[in-house]
Amino acid sequence: MDSATVYVGIDVAKEQLVVAVHPTQMCWETTNEQKAFPSLARRLLALRPTGIIVEATGRYHQPLARALAKAGLSVCIVNPRQVRQFAGAAGRLAKTDAIDAHVLARYGQALQPQPRGVRDAEAQQIQDLVARRRQLVRMRVAESNRLDGVSSVVAASGRRIIRTLDHEITSLDTAIDRALSAERWRDTAAIVASVPGIGPQSTRSLLTELPELGTLNAKEVAALVGVAPLNNDSGRFRGRRTTWGGRRDVRSTLYMATLSAVRYNPPIRAFYQHLVDAGKPKRVALIASLRKLVVLLNALVHQHRTWTLEVPRAA
């Protein structure tokens, strides 16, 4: 079969996979378990597909994606919202597992997304630790907010919960730092941490949730984070450019880092102040500074060098 024309879409559920092939309209089901992956990989390899398109489904797609990528197949993890928008534009309003699989295959054929998004088991474990830490921090904030105006008995209970959460957060920090001390992450961690404004938690988050850092150009990394300005023009109308999409957790991490960078990182501080002096709203200046910060980080990692006052050229 001509590999230039073949795309495979896989709809993933907890226990089941539905596989569709474009343009042959072939479709079949299999189980979503490790023992089924080798035979599925062999069947797909025989088709010589250009790409395997899988929606991000939390956890259920990850073992499948790793197994297929390890078998030598080109796997792309895609955003479910973008796929549903594509389905609507194509007039596919009905939704079944088989329809979803065919939509994924057609999405691949129409847009030809680049293979990206498959983490190995070790990287996924660290990312899970970072995500868990974020959950516990949010729980701690929620518990702290409940302490105001309650009885002493309830407040004491809340403080015990907070102490437990503090202990768990510290344990997670230790586990994450131990994992990131491995050789594959050590150099990148040192580069990221060298930038003024980037603290330990920002370093952990960027290494695990933005693994593409250093492999993309400036526009691509800004778009991946969701800080690439998008035009809003029509005819003679020229609308205000806005940012949209991207990885929310990474963007939140970088937002907090930028608040620090506009105070302690001289190039970022000068850039931010220049925009404010030019009349830009402070929030607009802050988002622009965030974009400059992530482009700077990307360039440093690409060039394998730590931060200095000399601003590196964007990758």
Residue map of PLM features:
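A detector of single, family-specific signature residues
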Residues: 1-315
